[in-house]
Amino acid sequence: MSNDGFSSLKFRRTSSKLQKDPPSVSSRILRSQQSNTSLKRHPSAPVHPRSSVTGSREHSRTRSNAYGSSSSSLEQHSGGPSPVLAGGDSNNSFSSKSRPGRFSFNTDPSSDELTGSPFDSRGMLSALEENTAESEKSPPPQPPTLRSYHTSPDSRGLRQSASFTALQNRMDTFTQKSENDQSTNTKRHSDEANGTKVFGRSKKSSFSSFVNSMLGSPRGIKISAPENPVHVTHVGYDNQTGQFTGLPKEWQRLLQENGISKKEQEEHPQTMVDIMRFYEKNARGDDEVWHKFDHAYAHHQPTANTPGSQRNSPPTSPRFPQNHEGSFENPRAPPPIPRGAPAATQAMSPPIGGLVPSRAPPKPPAPANMIPARPAPQPPVARPPQDAYANQFSTPPISESEPLPSEAQRSRSNSKTNGAQPQWAQPGAIASPAQYQQQQEQAMAAAQQAIVQNQLERSRSQRQQQSRGPEPKQPTQMGHSQHANDHTTALQSPQKAQPVPAARPRQRARQSNAVDVRARLLAICTPGDPTKLYYNLNKIGQGASGGVYTAYQHGTNNCVAIKQMNLDLQPKKELIINEILVMKDSKHKNIVNFLDSYLHGLDLWVVMEYMEGGSLTDVVTFNIMTEGQIAAVCRETLNGLQHLHSKGVIHRDIKSDNILLSLDGNIKLTDFGFCAQINDSQNKRNTMVGTPYWMAPEVVTRKEYGRKVDIWSLGIMAIEMIEGEPPYLTESPLRALYLIATNGTPTIKDEHNLSPVFRDFLHLALKVDPEKRASAHDLLMHPFMSLCSPLTHLAPLVKAARLSRAQEKAQKGGA
């Protein structure tokens, strides 16, 4: 075939194929070509993507695209003569150069050598088949192997649109580097670079990414997986299966050991969830209420090596030796001691059944991270009967959280009766009492110093983080905390060498507020040296945070009670301020009189009225009270509560331990550490505080509550005066919470022996629905108040309790 014939044939082929495309589109595309390259032969070029360049743009295509099967491909009629494969070489590559005109042919000498060559269609098809097979065997890494070779004219027109040219140039730079590594310098017409549909999606993705980066369009935020996740126990209830979900094995054992059967769990699933959530929060947390549970099991523990601490008679004062400062000032051990508790329950309670000589102090019942160290309980030395009262003051009402070294002798478990300090008269129980006491004092001093040092270092570290320049107050106030300089100096270097261990947020908050609390106390307290105002201090109680003393005031010779508290050992110092302010503002005949307060060195001295008769717990433990005497106690307590409620204060811990008596029978409320302020804007609380056996159902179930919780506790205290103990005292604390929440109003033994008016009084005070429960004012108007005996009729009960306590201590001493 001649050259003219070949040209005419090619022209006819080109024209026939161009008729399939819209003429306007093809014309626009062909006119946009700017490449001036010519067809070049590459004899041994490997199979790889080819690059189509339009100006500065490149586009990678696979070799197999050279002559696709699609009749619409421009590659078959790109305007150049059809090359002929020499010798059927399948590895040859073909390149063409764009031309300025639509139908202009290349006149470059390099293309002339192909002109006039015979058209070998069979060889060309063979080469195409071999190249296609080879491309399928080893496809290039990028882009992926193309399986469709159809080219859309519209797509080409869009890409070559003038409005997209600038963006396209920028877009191609993102992929140019990777494509250059895999492409050759072979050049084609720019319109031959059109991708297939598969490749179009890739280009579209790149184009969208580029436009988003240029226009600042928001991309989907990529959230990484959590790092170092900590699983928090979540307990639920499946209504379909009737089973708890996510209940830890420890909780399952705890429920079983506390006598809560699966049937009971299924009958009251929501109650169980509420109680267990409360336990989860408080068992490891800052709430002293849970640590009050300690004494509920203390009487189960065998008192090893302390034979004198064993009970000789049921009425023995419950509070005796469990002088554990973090313990639950819980109930005295009831006269009938529960014996059926499994051994596992004992594991729940701290090993404090008795003070074991020559042994390190027991670990606290709560997790170790709650308190850095806890001082060993110091055995009380033989003291006069005023102990009962002293122990009341040694209570740390100040902290509603942490096993606040609840100054050991506060509750019936340790505060009131002679039994509360069985070690007083136990010289025979220990070979050398002096050595034993010395060991305990040394252990206590070491533990207290460790706590102080740890807190001082954390305070110093916290202040350094908050501000590099020390505030004027801080050096002065922290200077008071430098009483253990030798120890803190030794501690500073290791503390600086390694970062301070991350404390819980609550602890950091307490440390950051320590200086402010001290500053507020300085504003509240009376300046001066209390040691010059009071003399003849006689220690009548000891707690981890300080001691309780009786003293006489210079000038008046009035006997007062002084509670000394080491501020550095108080977990929640702000509660001290709360207690002082409540007592200052609560001048009433039925509230223990607050006399004064002083900051003396590291200690806070709180001076109060001394109630030498002790607590009501002693009276109910050793005596049987008449309805008239019970009515008198209820009336005086209600008067004090009405005064508090009128000032927007909820006591939240009404029980016999916190009712003090004088030798004349006068009755006063004490222990305002759990008090809460309520007002018009916040007239409800939902914090679970108090002593569980006296808690109202709405407190146990963690509903909102108000003043009526004190009325429920008063009703329980009335039952306590009838039976000698509150309901469920023989049950484990967890089961007691369950029973309070599910049973509602407790049953009273021999209720038929009570007068109808007394039963009605109890019925109104123990309504489960707080809205239906009577108020303090309502109960003061109740007919039961007409039965009140004179307060002087209580004096014999106080004296009898003191005598019984003295006898009990004598028995312990002679054992």
From Swiss-Prot:
From which domain of life does this come? Eukaryota
The residues covered by the Protein kinase domain are 534-785
Q: Which family does it belong to?
A: Belongs to the protein kinase superfamily. STE Ser/Thr protein kinase family. STE20 subfamily.
Annotated ATP binding lies at I540, G541, Q542, G543, A544, S545, G546, G547, V548, K563
Per the record, the GO terms for biological process are: bipolar cellular bud site selection; budding cell apical bud growth; cellular response to hydrogen peroxide; invasive growth in response to glucose limitation; negative regulation of gene expression; negative regulation of sterol import; negative regulation of transcription by RNA polymerase II; osmosensory signaling pathway via Sho1 osmosensor
One Pfam match: Pkinase
Q: Where is the composition biased (Pro residues)?
A: 374-383
Catalytic residue list: D653 (proton acceptor)
Q: Locations of Polar residues compositional bias?
A: 24-38, 89-114, 148-160, 173-185, 302-314, 411-424, 474-493
Under Enzyme Commission nomenclature, its number is 2.7.11.1
- Catalytic activity line of the entry: L-seryl-[protein] + ATP = O-phospho-L-seryl-[protein] + ADP + H(+); L-threonyl-[protein] + ATP = O-phospho-L-threonyl-[protein] + ADP + H(+)
Protein name from the UniProt record = Serine/threonine-protein kinase ste20
Which residues belong to any copy of the CRIB domain? 223-236
UniProt KW Kinase keyword: yes
| Natural source organism | Aspergillus fumigatus (strain ATCC MYA-4609 / CBS 101355 / FGSC A1100 / Af293) (Neosartorya fumigata)
Q: Where is this protein localized, as stated in its record?
A: Cytoplasm; Nucleus
A GO term, aspect molecular function: MAP kinase kinase kinase kinase activity
Q: Which GO terms describe its cellular component?
A: cytoplasm; incipient cellular bud site; mating projection tip; nucleus
Q: Where is the composition biased (Low complexity)?
A: 68-82, 394-407, 429-455, 494-504
Transmembrane stretches in the record are none
Renumbered residue ranges of the record's region Disordered: 1-160, 173-200, 300-513
